[in-house]
Amino acid sequence: MRLFLVLFLSLLILPSVLPNQITSDDLIQYRIKSTRAAILDLQSEFGNDYPNARKYLKELSRLEKSFAKGADIRDALKKFRKKALLENPLLRIDGVLCVKRRMPELAEEVLDPKHRKSMFGWGGKVTQGLKALGLPSNHECNSSLSKTGYDNAIVVLDPIHPNREMKTLYTAPDSGYVGEIDLHWNAEKMLFTQSDSMSWKVFEIKIDGSGQRQVSQTPHDVDCGDACYMPNGNIVFGSTASIQSVPCWHGQRRVSNLYAMKNDGSGIRQVCFDQDHNFHPSMLPNGQVLFHRWDYTGISHIYFRQLMVMNPDGTGQRAIYGSNSWFPNSLYFPRALPGSSSKIIAILSGYHGAHRMGQLVILDTHQGFYEEKGLVQRLSGCGQAIEPKIRDNLVDEDWPKFLHPFPLSDKYFLVSAWLEPKGSWGIYLADVFDNLVLVKEIPGYALLEPIPIKKRPEPAIIPSRVDLSKNEAVVYLHDVYAGPGLTGVPRNVVKSLRVFSYDFGYPGMAGAHKIGIGGPWEATRILGTVPLE
């Protein structure tokens, strides 16, 4: 009965979304409510493993009463929230993996508030600084970044004692890039991307920093990275081996598609044959690979970036969010919430502008998959709502900005956040009650890619359906009338389908100035016509 009552009360006091124009007093009241909701949830969820709940609730009530009497409680509330919320039992783990990378200095005139709307402008100082930080623009892959010149390392943070010095696990030699970590669900080893003066490669090390080995085995003119373990023992990763070019860059930048390989780097096979980039592969509990696909194929170029799934062998590819949508432009770094293959946390971002950073959102494909229909919550720490805007530079003016979310549970998350332009990227604890609490930051450095070091359930294994002795495939299209494309067209009117293909451009051979500005940016071919049954 007590458990039910606590849950009921926590639901009653969940903070609502605040209006766009708020005062500092509004924000304090909001954070009192969000903090109370989280404490009640931790008390309900963990009981004696969160022993100070009652004490914290009393202390929060005292702060609330002082605030009602006109006292300035901002500093006291900030300290209290950090103490109470970082005692979350989910943080009692062996540490948090993250990437520590030096941030480039940004000029004061760029950071001036009057330049906030244009600070992520094309070719601007902030844009160049983000690339120096190892963050390619939204329509580029790592191949567009400098291969050397990074001050970075894989480190381990103690979330219970964040003031302790972090342990350095691995530093790339010769100022190479190191990042894009994927921790195996047994928490004993990890994949990561490393660059040298020649190319980008996939490596693996054990959780103690030993046993480093290069996994990807490709020629020096092929880049590899963004790797993810799969439960069948293979690895899915991004590579420029297709030798395609990004059409919006007029053929100047390389495309990264997804490939699969064995654990020793052999047996490389292309599994995504897309016009543009495939990013951020991660595993769903049901055994499917979740990834982000960039599309330009004869559609509204600024707005189509689908979330996709496929089987580990590359079959069964389909969009699960964003097909035919104008909002959001992009959903980067998607990860499934524990135990669910429909609930996903991701970064909502734009087309041009801020590099893959943006709003922290939770989506549920069972709630919807079109525009804002499945976006169930935005987490900002200050009550900001999801606003379905159809806009190119969608999130440039939004603060705070987020990267690399990783769920601790279905309610609590680690995430990298940049609260304001003059700050640093730090590691934060976020929750569904809209709290955002700093775990660790280091002035002058960015702390990115937080991953809790703990064992996770192994995803399901989906048997391979690929017969490599054959060079044909079967495509199932069970209802051409489904979806908005043929809305209002009576059944049995369509008699046949025309099948055509894109010939994706090699470097220097794609782009709007070569084929068409508003239509396809590459050559297309009609393959034939097939009758409908």
How does the language model describe each region?
Residues 47-141, 145-168, 508:
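Long amphipathic alpha-helical scaffold segments
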Residues 101-149, 195, 237-254, 291-305, ...:
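Short, conserved, GDST-rich strand-edge loop motifs in beta-rich repeat architectures
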Residues 337-428:
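Loop/turn-rich, solvent-exposed surfaces of beta-rich toroidal or solenoidal domains
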Residues 91-92, 185-186, 230-232, 284-286, ...:
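Residue-level detector of Asp-centered blade-edge/turn motifs that repeat once per structural unit
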Residues 162-176, 206-223, 262-276, 311-330, ...:
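Multi-bladed beta-propeller domains
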Residues 152-159, 203-208, 253-264, 304-315, ...:
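Beta-propeller blade signature
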